[in-house]
Each structure stands twice: as C-alpha cells, then as structure tokens.
Swiss-Prot record:
UniProt tissue specificity: Coelomic liquid (at protein level). Expressed in large fat cells in contact with coelomic cavities, in intestinal epithelia and at the epidermis level.
Name the record gives this protein: Theromacin
Induction profile: After blood meal ingestion and upon bacterial challenge.
Pfam family of the protein (one): Macin
S-S bridge residues: C24-C31, C46-C50, C53-C95, C61-C69, C79-C81
Organism: Theromyzon tessulatum (Duck leech)
Cellular location(s): Secreted
Biological process annotations from GO: defense response
Cited function: Has a bactericidal activity. Active against M.luteus. No activity toward E.coli and F.oxysporum.
Length: 97
C-alpha cells in the first residue's frame, strides 16, 4: 500500500511540474545539459538515438537556446540526425524517449 501512495504522489508531482513547465518539454532534448544525467540510463544519447531509431549516419548536438523555458534549460542543445534513412522506429521502446 505504501508503494501505491508513493507512486500516486510522484505522479501528481510530475503532472504539476509538466503543467507549470509545459513549454519546457518542447525545448528539451537528449542533448540538454540540465538533463544529461539521464542520458544512457533513461534515454539513448544523440548519436545512438539517430543510428538506431532513424538509421542515420550519426547524431550531433547543436546549440539551441530555449525559447519556452530559458530559466530551466540554460545552454540548451538539440539533437540533429545526419542523413536519416527512415522515419522514427516507434516499435522500438528505446526510441520512445
């Protein structure tokens, strides 16, 4: 029962944060320095993401200042896939995030 309560609180907290910072998600990228701790654990790095999910030659991070959330995403970067050969592979769970 304790686990359910904890998960409920975590879910509510996540929803509140998402609503408050709805624009932040649009600017976020796997290259964003502020979320780099999750790279390789929660999501693929840019190069791997592009190669596996788009069959691209490579992926690279480039400077992309946050328009919606500059206070939360300073020095923001975005991932760009070079020579992507396919649409995103949504059947592969590692390509979802």
């Amino acid at each position: 029962m304790e686990l359910k309560s904890g998960l409920s609180i975590l879910l509510c907290f996540g929803i509140c944060i998402a609503v408050i910072n709805a624009g932040c998600f649009e600017d976020w990228s796997r290259c964003s320095p502020s979320t780099s701790r999750g790279t390789g654990v929660l999501w693929r790095d840019c190069d791997s993401y592009c190669k596996v999910c788009f069959k691209a030659d490579r992926g690279e991070c480039f400077d992309s200042p946050s328009l919606n959330c500059p206070q939360r995403l300073p020095n923001n970067k975005q991932c760009r896939c070079i020579n992507a050969r396919t649409a995103k592979d949504n059947r592969n769970p590692t390509c979802w995030a």
